[in-house]
Amino acid sequence: AFALQEQAAQAGLPLRCTILESDPSWGGKIVTHRIGDIVTEAGPDSFLSQKQAGLDLCTKLGLADQLINTNETGKKACVLHRGRLHDLPEGLLSFVPKQLGPFLQSGLLSWVGLVRMGLEFAVPPGSPRDDESLAEFLRRRFGVQAYERLLEPLMAGIYAGDAEQMSLRATFPRFFELEQQHGSIMRGMMAAKKSASSSASSQPRRTMFVSLKNGLSELVSALTTRLMQQGVELRAGVQVDALRVRSHELGRWMYDLILQDGSALSAESVVLATPAYVSADLLRPLTPIAGGLLDLIPYASTATIAMAFPRSLTSAIDGFGFIIPRQEQRHLIAATWTSLKWPHRAPSDQLLVRCYVGGVGREDILQREDQALVATVREELANICGIKAEPVYTEVNRWWKAMPQYTIGHLDRLVQLDAALSRYPGLVLTGAAYRGVGIPDCIRDGAVAAGQVVRDLLGKVHPGRE
């Protein structure tokens, strides 16, 4: 809606915009809780600074001075291997470890595994026509050991997914591009790093992930305030039960939204930013093909458990947290030492921890009651890193069918979806189900959707969305 107001003004297009939200509050999965001096995030706790859309929106909303980097000290992260935590090599996310010595001596990979990972430079590129799974791609390029012990929890964990089912080109298109352009991920990453250092920006230095000083809900508050100032009508707690289409006297479609209370809202353009399974139900009567394609986008359920412990009893804990490979067969997916990673998150005498459970193939634990879920997580924390203290604060946040899964064939299905909707100008889909699950991805996709709406309302023929 923000991008739509911006682009409509630039095009000289007058419009009246209404936003309907079924939840009683705004922000979707962005939910910040403030309890005294403790700040927790029920959903995402940060966003990638390398994707400019998030930073740009914060700047436009006057939040640039509220952006915070991760702490400078104690940056290390760990991975669990055979029941023990091992330091992850710095630079692993770019596949170019900054210090080879500690990595070689860590015991994470055998010498055979290390040599195989290093041979990535010599592995020929795969076919540009194949939609390879993320697991197949990473094993092919880096070997089985590196995949199972390092890369699977790092990459698949972002989507709470199963790398065997995830589409490489839909989830990590950059890896596909680097392989095709440079013949090697490592070679491509080094070239990208060299290019970035030669074109250093005058903008403030940002860590890979950034957040907002008082939590990400600041972004939601600033956005809703700005929209109301622009005259946008915001209606929370309003559920749409049906979407109908009728012919307009000027020869274009008109859309009728049938609300839960029986009333209706008519519009020349409708943007559905709902989960794919909700959009499927709304679109199926208009186009069964689109409804069926949307049904093919599965969702994973997850939960986050936040706990605050006395720092005096957890003084040995350092770094930013740890990840757990699927092969370790734990309930925990990962844990973040929130108060060590971010400033302004907890009093100095407390350690704030955020734990993650659930995801594809590991959702059974979510059926447990809160108390049992917390007990399970505490038991694993005690076993893995020795935290046996009683938490002084605990909260559980469950997210049912919250994380869309980009399975093999996802991009082809999006092309078919666009074709199925092409006969309904002004009807647009956007959100995390399609072209990226991160906050900057959704901001960018929302801006693309806004551009499509403006073109439709101006009566221009628009090209297919990228």
Model-assigned labels for residue ranges:
Residues 236-353, 360-367, 371, 379-384, ...:
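Mid-domain catalytic core of redox enzymes
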Residues 36-125:
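Dinucleotide-binding Rossmann-like beta1-alpha1 core, especially the glycine-rich loop
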Residues 76, 96, 100, 113-242, ...:
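Active-site/ligand-binding neighborhood in enzyme catalytic cores
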Residues 2-10, 32, 225, 284, ...:
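Short, well-ordered alpha-helices that flank and scaffold nucleotide-derived cofactor binding pockets
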Residues 33-41, 288, 411:
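Short glycine/proline- and charge-enriched loop/turn segments
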Residues 5-35:
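Glycine-rich FAD pyrophosphate-binding loop
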Residues 15-17, 270, 391-394:
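Hydrophobic anchor at the start of a short beta-strand
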